[in-house]
Amino acid sequence: MNSRRKFIKTGMLGMAAINLLPAINSFANQSAYNPGKPNAKFKLRFAIASDGHYAQPDTNSDLFYSDLIKWLNKDHHNNHLDMVIINGDLVHNRPDLLSKVKETYLDKLSVPYFTIPGNHDYADAAVWKGVFGYEDKYVVDKGDIGFVFANTADTKGGYVCPDYGFMNRSLDQFKNKKIVFVILHIAPHQWLIEEKAIFTDCPEIITLLHSYPNVKAAFHGHDHSLDGIRYTGKLPHLFDSHFGGNWGTEYKGYRIVEVTADNQIAT
């Protein structure tokens, strides 16, 4: 990925700006990504990946996971990562293998990691807590920065809107944060008519996200062919393609997000 598209979002004084670039094409071309400020000190630097689809038939999902862990640990060694997010579809219709994915691969990460279910994980709060120690919707507090994670699927793989009550309470809890990031496997908005079978239509969630000016971006997986950015109003929705599965972009990869001391956001 040699061409780097730039998207600039600026707002009121005191609001974070966001400089958005495509997701890292790390597996296809390790030289594709170059940090904007080498050796810079960041308030927070994290990686986000999705759609590993462990145990999908006719795929080498063990290789996909081992590659992801290798690349993330290398990135941490070279540039430092504060955390990693795996945004859904950790397994492919095999919730019984979530523990294996955790113990064999994710626990090998050199940094803390957080996960959220996707539609192929067939998981609810009880399943997720049994494996990862937290439920399928939760918040993470990183000082000036807050993360809101919510499940967007049921235990049969159906698509659902995020729990509105939880989202409302969580965003209100973080209303004094400088920056809030929202992590949802399935995007709660359909940009195109053809996406009725791909994303959910949750106008109340979109309105809620727009009502908090410190919500700076939403991150989604699910559509393996999307690596880039879409908007609802002025809110960026970022996609990171996939690191597993048998369809989507030709490359597999992940996204790096960097927040500077003055709350500039780059990815």
Give residue ranges: language-model regions.
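N-terminal secretory signal peptides and thylakoid transit peptides that target proteins
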Residues: 1-22
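N-terminal active-site segment of His-dependent metallophosphoesterases
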Residues: 21-99
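Binuclear metal-dependent phosphoesterase catalytic core
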Residues: 33, 38-40, 49, 60-62, ...
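Beta-strand-turn-beta hairpins that frame and shape the catalytic cleft
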Residues: 37-47, 139-149, 175-179, 231-236
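Acidic/histidine-rich helix-loop elements
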Residues: 47-66, 92-93, 122-132, 155-160, ...
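Active-site glycine-centered loops adjacent to acidic/histidine catalytic or metal-binding residues
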Residues: 51, 88-89, 118, 185, ...
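His/acidic metal-ligating clusters that form di-metal
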Residues: 71-83, 157-237, 265
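Metal-dependent catalytic neighborhoods of phosphoester/phosphodiester hydrolases
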Residues: 87-106, 123-133, 193-194, 227-233
